[in-house]
């Protein structure tokens, strides 16, 4: 017995003497239901849980299930037994860890879990605990679980999150969290906000992004319908005086609303970088946006019947891009006159899809007199092919008429354009015609790179004696 006690004492001493970093690494490798049990081995381990600055509580299956199931709701409306068991284990683990917490600050809380109706108050209490401990980074991924044809649980983000004076970085992805910010004093130190939404249920999208006085980076992604109720249209309002970088990636569920498209208004006087991606074009409005340097626009779904709508609303979207130096744009169709003048544009990436509206390239060349670098990339899109059906192969692929030469050579070709990259071309007649035109008229062109095999048709054509022609 004596030797056994002595051995246990030696083990306890060794555990107590382990460096903090090594303890952290050991615990990170253990399954959570075993990790918390380490508190019985040594006071040092218990103290570790009471003061560890970074807390990661992640249900391992959540990301995979969420990625597979785009509706975020189990198809059967039922839990798998192993998921339910793991979920309960996680609840106990998180509650146990936070119940041991001493007065030390929490630097980061990462909480990725499911949420049933009976879990709402518990999850909210964990968030409030993090706020009380001066959390700096908060990462929430909360997935509601509920039966088909039932209303899911609603978790209102605690008011203390909005008023937290230490929170700098906030990420939230949820199909059940709602946002009701106070009228003043919100997010006094928040610099980065990443919100992933699914079918916002109220007018919170008008409020959440307009109460961040020092916000510099904002990302809004997710799936939306056009309306939040039968009488209220969905609106996103971004008003942030210090915002420098904005990402909007929203996709529309056409099953949930057939009224006018949702709207997005942006007031950001210091905005420098904007990245926009939609499968339908919302109604955009901009105010005090005059500092853009870099922009990206991707309207990624094409329907022929949608062309007039896009052309009608595209000018409002593109108007603040007049000042950019770097632009990437991927659209299926824009009528002539939709583009502003790009007097400061130096680098352009133009993604052409299978509907091949080459007039857009012509207009860009004409409206970008100082363009120095051009990337043209063809991207296959089966939706275009399906929309055109048999006319696609007869009228699009094998016709030189898809490209119309400009009436006069654009200024950028004769004076500034030094680099051209062509990607994804298949060697169709209109593609060869475009490449030949650029090569023939690029008077100051230094390098043209073609990622394709139709090099034999271009080898002997150069408008600039200094141009290096490269095929890869």
Where on the chain are the PLM-derived regions?
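Alpha-helix capping/termination and helix-coil
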Residues: 325-331, 346-352, 356, 365-378, ...
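A structural signal for leucine-rich repeat
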Residues: 124-129, 151-165, 182-190, 206-214, ...
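C-terminal helix/juxtamembrane-tail motif
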Residues: 2-4, 452-472
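C-terminal structured "cap/appendage" subdomains that terminate the fold
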Residues: 416-452
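Leucine-rich repeat
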Residues: 2-231, 235-237, 412, ...
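Conserved hydrophobic position(s) of the canonical leucine-rich repeat
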Residues: 52, 106, 135-137, 167, ...
